[in-house]
């Protein structure tokens, strides 16, 4: 279940984030430096592994904290040398064979070996698709190559909580509908429509020339999908639900903790990206102020074939 996403890796709803690293214990630039700053205990464990010469190409280092997991994926031998396609493939082979054993339930990758690694994304992408597209967990690749300007600008709004129950979620939707006086605009095309609650728990939609309904089960599907990652149109079974999706997405996008992103599936045309929604979890950013904790060997794994 591979999806390309245009968001920061650190905004991902995935359980595990992939950090591209070298074998000499240095995280001095790019995404690795940001990982080091956000997860100092992870960096300490990784550096210790490198100092003992126990890390190599084709090995993966999984570091687990209570909130987030980080998978250190070696794409370079040293920061002084570029990446190689063979390094990427060696690591992906290990990941595809061992992600279940590691307990990984969802994961976000950057374009492996690109950027500071100097690899061409046109060469890396098919390798990543080969190993990741058929895995049985949500896999997100934060691909900055996707067409820019597709997503309407979304205001950053602070929020005090994320709902823990479907009932709280419904109440938040009701409050947003009241705040907007029942008037919203679709994400694509910005077409205005009206929305009001139906007695059965669904939402009645009034748009130019037609009326329709978002059934209660569609809202439940969206809630369930948001708990596990990014919700997209292809998760809505049937034509009726997909038509209702464009209205439901517009309403949900107004919730202060929901973010809109551009997504694309490997099987889609390059020119047909779509919208996805995910919950912005503020605790990703809280790690910027985290404090080192004593090293616990039980919090990490180092695997190879």
Locations of regions flagged by a protein language model:
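Macrodomain-like recognition of ADP-ribose-binding/processing modules
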Residues: 1-249, 253-305
């Amino acid at each position: 279940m591979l999806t390309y996403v245009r968001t920061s890796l650190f905004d991902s709803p995935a359980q595990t984030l992939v950090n591209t690293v070298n074998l000499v214990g240095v995280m001095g630039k790019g995404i690795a430096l940001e990982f080091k700053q956000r997860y100092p205990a992870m960096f300490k464990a990784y550096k210790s592994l490198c100092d003992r010469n126990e890390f190599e190409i084709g090995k993966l280092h999984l570091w687990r904290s209570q909130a987030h997991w980080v998978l250190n994926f070696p794409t370079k031998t040293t920061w002084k040398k570029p990446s190689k396609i063979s390094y990427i493939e060696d690591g992906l082979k290990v990941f595809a064979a061992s992600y279940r054993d590691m307990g990984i339930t969802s994961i976000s990758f950057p374009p492996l070996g690109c950027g500071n690694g100097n690899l061409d994304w046109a060469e890396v992408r098919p390798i990543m698709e080969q190993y990741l597209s058929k895995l049985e967990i949500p896999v997100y690749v934060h691909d900055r190559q996707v067409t820019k300007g597709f997503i309407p600008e979304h205001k950053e709004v602070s929020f005090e909580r994320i709902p823990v129950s479907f009932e709280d979620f419904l109440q938040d939707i009701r409050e947003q509908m009241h705040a907007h006086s029942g008037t919203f605009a679709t994400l694509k095309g910005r077409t205005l429509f009206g929305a009001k609650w139906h007695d059965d728990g669904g939402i009645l939609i009034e748009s130019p020339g037609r009326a329709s309904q978002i059934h209660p089960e569609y809202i439940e599907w969206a809630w369930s999908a948001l708990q596990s990652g990014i919700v997209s149109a292809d998760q809505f079974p049937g034509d009726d639900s997909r038509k209702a999706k464009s209205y439901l997405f517009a309403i949900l996008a107004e919730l202060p903790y929901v973010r809109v992103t551009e997504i694309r599936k490997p099987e889609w045309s390059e020119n047909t990206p779509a919208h996805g929604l995910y919950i912005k979890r503020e605790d990703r950013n809280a790690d910027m102020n985290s404090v080192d904790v004593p090293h616990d060997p039980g919090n990490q794994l180092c695997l190879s074939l």
